Each structure stands twice: as structure tokens, then as C-alpha cells.
UniProtKB/Swiss-Prot annotation:
It comes from Drosophila melanogaster (Fruit fly). Belongs to the TAPT1 family. PANTHER family: TRANSMEMBRANE ANTERIOR POSTERIOR TRANSFORMATION PROTEIN 1 HOMOLOG (PTHR13317:SF4). Its main location: membrane. Residues 24-38 have a biased composition (Basic and acidic residues). This is Protein TAPT1 homolog. It is a multi-pass membrane protein. GO terms for biological process: positive regulation of cilium assembly.
Length: 676
């Protein structure tokens, strides 16, 4: 009976032999004995070859055994001591830890850069909002006066019938004033006190759901409203000779009135809900409304954002913050009117208003900090956003702008001032009585204060815009030379006459046409000169060719037109940073005039970019160097090919030439020459 046992990592065969007197176990190490017999001659040869190996091996074995014995004798105290005294070498991963530290610093700087953009965006929103209350009534009165006076002049034939009664700007001002006053008069018929008590009688859950529905509706109407207003303005000011495909001006006026009325009613319900939450004895509704911002944080942080998406989100946050500030101002007016303008009630409700506004600001900080952290966006991106708003500001301050500033702000941030202005006028009209002269004097002072504030905001915003544009253009001017590293910089060389320059150009072109580089076993070495040689000592062997601008691909221009104003050429429009659809990649080329602003205007010369050495012979050129029939076929095939819109890569061969070359005789590779 045989069995197998594992002992000391080896296998032993045990045979049990039975006899008459009892049993005896014999251990038979067959495999071990055979292995020892096989290894014995080899070990003797090794010992004879290296007699000093045995003592060294013995000492190593002794050290191993002693180390094993020491390891076996380690205690828990030794383990605890090693864990308590273990060292750290952080400098071995210095780059990773430095990057982590910079990310933390960038995370902490995000609120500062975000608030700079927020302040500038709120300035533009306030400028557009105050325009409705200050300058629009004056422009509306001027438009009405122009309409009446010009109509009377046409009746008495003091004005020709071919002239338009109103300019496009006057038509837009007239329509804005009519819409604003009509919706305001309709909203004054709504009883705000009854709406307040109806909302207050509802449960907290119903009010929470209703407030969320109002927020969603506000965003949807803001996205839809500006298109309605733009359609009305274009329909009213469209030229008569153009093809009219619309419903008519009255239909668009009706659409716009319905939109402004619905949006104004929605904002009125928002202000009433916020008023109930602030003035209620149970602060549960206010707490739920504040906690609603954290739901927005959850829905925004864990999404992927790029520069354009983050810009839209940031502009939406600017609009929401300004919108919330105006709503809180309306709530304060309504509450103070109910408590007879008591300063005690103002001090009671002020902390709640600050809590709502501070929560909105804090959520914006955390949201943008984590969005930039997760999407690897730098904090300097908010400066680019501010620069884009600066270009919007300057574009609408021209004498004949394409649109009103409020319209452009609405398109950029989704802020439409008309509904919010209607609700504010309703709140002020119901809170203040105009029964005596003092009230009208206070109203006049308030109007003058609002106009002065709007003028100050315009001056500050426009000055900030000019400063940002100047800094942006300076950065672009400083970065323009670095983007043209392949073009050698022409230094202040010795003056050369036009005749000498023309002679040198002719000689250089002839020399370059006669020279060729033979491609052998070793590739040619290309040397790039950072500083070009002077005009009088130009080395032809460097393979530089000099040609005038008239021989380049750019069209010829007069000498007066060749002067370039770098500052004016780098000015961008409203969508300068984010409008990639305006660039045609097929027409992109290097503007030689940028590099020649310091040269003479008579004959301007540049160094052409040095050709690259190909990794293999030019198959098109080799095909042309063959017999005449094959070359003619290749030319015809090349002419039939469609025009390429992009460059072929250096290692990409010409496929038609390879097909035509298949029937021709082989060409020796060692004697081929390619002209660069």
C-alpha cells in the first residue's frame, strides 16, 4: 500500500510492509536518491572549476538561515516600533504634490474671479433694467412727438410722401413704450392682497412645488421671450422692398403683449411666494426654498462642462442673482407698505432677506469651484468671459448699433427687463400714494436719482470694457510673433536699394533653381537659423529664397493699403471668443503684412519658410523624371483629380502616380535627385 505525504516541501513515498510478527514502516526515498545521484557529478565538476565558491555559498547560506531565524523571532513590539518610526520621502513625487497644491489654490481663487465676472454682469443687467425706467420714457415721448409733427407736416405738404415718418430706432422705442405701458395698466388691475392670502392659505408642500414650477416657467419664458420681441421689431422695421413673409405687425404686437403679460404674472407670483415665506411665522417654507438651491448644486456639479457651456451657466447665474435681488426689493416694498413703513419690521425681515441672498451666493461659489475642479478648467477663464461681455458693451455704444443694449444683454444672459420692470412699477404704485405735491416731488427726485445711477453705471461699465479690450488686444499683439515661429524674424539690417534688392532676388532664384540635393543613404541635415543673415551677405547654400509680396498668394494691394494697423485689425466683435463658425479653414493663411510692419512700404520682402526634407523620394517628381509617355499620363491623371482642400502629409505618396508608375520601368534609387 502506497501513500504520498508532503514534508519539508518534498514528496516521500511510504511503503507499508506487513509480516507475521507485526507491521513495519519503511521510508523509501526513491526520487530524492535518484536526483542526488544525478546532481553529484555536476556538483563535483563545479567544485573543481571554482574551488572558492563553496565557502562563499556556505557563508551565504548561513546568513540566510540566521536572517530567517531572526525573522521568525520578531515580536509585535518590533512591528509596532517600525510602524511608529517609519519615514516619508515626499520629495520623490514633487510634481504631483505641487500640482495638487496648485489645484487647492485655484479652488480657493475661484470665488474671487467669479465675483468679478458677477459684478460686471450685474452692472450690465442693472444698466439695461434702469434704461427701461429712465431713458425709454424720454425716447418714447420723442418718438410720439416725431410721429405727430411729421404727420402734420406731411398733411400740409411740408414733407415729401416718399420719406419715412419714423426711423427704425424710433419705431422700436414706440413699440417698447406701448407694450410696457399696456401691460402695466393691465397688471394694476390685479389685486395683490387677495393673491397673497390665497397663497398663504396653502400648505408648505404645495407652496414648495408651486415655487419650483414658477422657476422652471421663468426660465422657459425668458428663453422664448426675446425671440418674440426681436420678431416684432424686425417685422415693424423691415424694408418695404423685401419679400414679406410674416403675419403682420399687429399680430406680432399681440403675441408680444401676451408674452409680457404672462411673464409679468409669473414674476408677480414668485414675489408673492417669497413674501409669504419671509413674513410667515413658520420658517419652514423659507428653509425649504433655501434648501432648493442645493438641488441645483447636485444637478450642475456632476455634469461635464466645456468653456461654452460654463459661460452659459455663468450668465444664467448672473441673471438669477439680479432677478432674486429685484424680487427681494419688491418684497421689502410690499411688506413695509403693510406695516406703515415701520423701521422695526424692516430690521426683523432684513436677516431673512440676507439669508436667502447669501445662500444663493454661497451655492454659486461651491458650484463653480467644483465644476472647474472636475473639468480641469483654469480660474482665468472667468476673465475671458468678462472680456466677452466687454465687447458686447462697446458694440452697442456705437452711433448706429445693430441692436439696443438691453436686447444684446438679453441674448447673452437671458435677462429680459420688461416683465420685471412691470412688476416693480406695480409694487411701487400700490405702495406710494400720489395725492399731494410732496409725493410728486419725491417721485421726481427718485427719477433723477435713477437716471444719475444709470449714467454712472454706464460710465463705469464702458470704462471697464475699454480697459479689458485694451488689455486683450495687448495680449494678442504680444502673442502674435510667438505664433509664427517658422518665419525668420527680419532684424534691422543695412539699408539696401531697390535695384540691388531686385538683382539679389534674381540671382538667388537662379541659384536655387539650379541647385539640387541628391538623396542617398544619409538624409540631408537641415539647419534652422534663428537670426537671419544680413541682406548684403546672404548665403545661398542655406536654401533661403527671397521674393516680394507681390509674388505670394495674397492679392496685390496699393502701397497705401499695405500699411497695417495692428490694433484695429485685432478688434473683435460680441462673439469674439466663442464664434468659431465665422472662420473658414480653407481660406486660412499667413498674413505677411503682420511681419512686415517695420519694413519699408516700397518693396517689402520676407524669407520664405524653408522646405522640409522628405523621409522618402517624391514619387510625383520621380514619375515626371521618367519617359515622356508616362509623364504625360501622370499629368492628365493629376488634372482629372478633384482639388484638394488640405495639404498632403509629408510621408503620403501620390496614389495616381504610383498606379501609372506600375507599368513603367524601374528607376534606380541611388541616383535620384529631388529639388527642394
Amino acid at each position: 500500500m502506497n501513500a504520498t505525504l508532503n514534508s519539508a516541501g518534498g514528496k516521500r513515498q511510504l511503503r507499508f510492509r506487513g509480516d507475521v510478527t507485526g507491521s513495519r514502516v519503511e521510508e523509501l526515498h526513491h526520487q530524492q536518491q535518484e536526483e542526488q545521484k544525478q546532481k553529484a557529478p555536476l556538483a563535483q565538476d563545479d567544485v573543481a572549476a571554482t574551488p572558492t565558491a563553496t565557502p562563499a555559498a556556505g557563508s551565504a547560506q548561513q546568513r540566510l538561515q540566521s536572517g530567517t531565524a531572526e525573522t521568525c523571532t520578531n515580536t509585535f513590539y518590533d512591528f509596532f516600533k517600525v510602524e511608529m518610526t517609519r519615514g516619508y520621502m515626499l520629495e520623490h513625487d514633487e510634481e504631483r504634490y505641487s500640482a495638487r497644491r496648485q489645484k487647492i489654490y485655484s479652488f480657493m481663487r475661484i470665488p474671487r474671479d467669479l465675483e468679478r465676472f458677477m459684478v460686471y454682469g450685474i452692472m450690465q443687467c442693472a444698466d439695461s433694467f434702469l434704461y427701461i425706467h429712465t431713458f425709454l420714457p424720454v425716447r418714447f415721448v420723442m418718438a410720439v412727438w416725431a410721429l405727430v409733427s411729421r404727420t402734420v407736416a406731411r398733411i400740409f405738404r411740408l414733407r415729401s410722401s416718399g420719406q419715412r415718418l419714423l426711423s427704425p430706432a424710433e419705431i422700436c422705442d414706440l413699440l417698447k413704450g406701448v407694450i410696457w405701458m399696456t401691460v402695466t395698466l393691465i397688471m394694476l388691475l390685479v389685486d395683490t392682497n387677495r393673491v397673497y392670502h390665497i397663497i398663504k392659505s396653502q400648505s408648505i408642500i404645495k407652496l414648495y412645488i408651486f415655487y419650483n414650477m414658477l422657476e422652471v416657467g421663468d426660465r422657459l419664458l425668458s428663453a422664448f421671450g426675446q425671440d418674440t420681441i426681436d420678431a416684432l421689431f424686425w417685422t415693424a422695421t423691415e424694408p418695404k422692398n423685401s419679400k414679406r413673409e410674416h403675419f403682420g405687425v399687429l399680430t406680432h404686437v399681440l403675441f408680444t403683449l401676451i408674452y409680457v403679460f404672462l411673464h409679468s404674472g409669473l414674476i408677480m407670483f414668485q414675489a408673492t411666494c417669497l413674501n409669504v415665506a419671509v413674513n410667515s411665522n413658520n420658517k419652514g417654507l423659507l428653509t425649504i426654498m433655501i434648501s432648493n438651491n442645493f438641488v441645483e448644486l447636485k444637478g450642475s456639479v456632476f455634469k461635464k462642462f466645456d468653456k461654452n457651456n460654463l459661460f452659459q451657466l455663468t450668465c444664467s447665474d448672473v441673471r438669477e442673482r439680479f432677478h432674486l435681488s429685484v424680487l427681494l426689493f419688491i418684497v421689502v416694498i410690499q411688506t413695509m407698505k403693510e406695516f406703515d413703513w415701520s423701521i422695526t419690521q424692516f430690521c426683523v425681515m432684513l436677516p431673512d432677506c440676507f439669508a436667502v441672498l447669501f445662500t444663493e451666493i454661497l451655492i454659486d461659489w461651491v458650484k463653480h469651484a467644483f465644476i472647474t475642479r472636475f473639468n480641469e478648467l483654469p480660474e482665468s477663464i472667468y476673465r475671458e468671459y468678462t472680456t466677452s461681455l466687454a465687447y458686447d458693451m462697446t458694440q452697442t455704444r456705437q452711433k448706429h448699433a445693430f441692436s439696443d443694449h438691453s436686447d444684446l444683454v438679453a441674448r447673452r444672459m437671458g435677462f429680459i427687463p420688461f416683465p420685471l420692470a412691470v412688476v416693480l412699477i406695480k409694487a411701487i404704485y400700490t405702495a406710494v400714494s400720489f395725492e399731494n405735491l410732496a409725493a410728486w416731488l419725491l417721485f421726481l427726485l427718485a427719477y433723477l436719482f435713477a437716471m444719475g445711477l444709470r449714467i454712472c453705471l454706464t460710465i463705469c461699465a464702458l470704462g471697464k470694457a475699454c480697459k479689458l479690450m485694451k488689455e486683450h488686444q495687448t495680449e494678442r499683439n504680444s502673442s502674435t510673433p510667438s505664433s509664427m515661429t517658422n518665419v525668420p524674424v527680419i532684424g534691422a539690417a543695412a539699408p539696401v536699394s531697390a535695384a540691388a534688392t531686385g538683382g539679389q532676388n534674381h540671382n538667388n532664384n537662379n541659384n536655387n533653381n539650379n541647385n539640387s540635393i541628391s538623396i542617398g543613404s544619409k538624409p540631408a541635415q537641415v539647419t534652422t537659423l534663428l537670426t537671419p543673415p544680413s541682406a548684403g551677405h546672404l548665403d545661398v547654400s542655406k536654401n533661403f529664397s527671397r521674393t516680394s509680396i507681390a509674388s505670394t498668394s495674397t492679392p496685390k494691394k496699393a502701397v497705401s493699403e499695405q500699411e497695417l494697423d495692428v490694433t484695429n485689425s485685432l478688434e473683435l466683435g460680441a462673439t469674439a471668443l466663442f464664434s468659431n463658425s465665422d472662420v473658414d479653414l480653407d481660406d486660412v493663411c499667413l498674413n505677411e503684412q503682420v511681419t512686415n510692419t517695420n519694413t519699408s512700404s516700397a518693396v517689402q520682402e520676407v524669407y520664405q519658410e524653408q522646405d522640409l526634407v522628405r523621409s522618402q523620394p517624391d514619387l510625383m517628381l520621380l514619375n515626371n523624371s521618367g519617359d515622356g509617355v508616362t509623364s504625360a499620363k501622370a499629368k492628365k491623371a493629376t488634372q482629372r483629380l478633384p482639388k484638394r482642400t488640405h495639404k498632403r502629409s509629408e510621408s503620403e505618396p501620390g496614389m495616381p502616380s504610383m498606379v501609372e508608375k506600375g507599368g513603367a520601368a524601374g528607376i534606380a534609387g541611388g541616383n535620384q535627385t529631388t529639388q527642394l
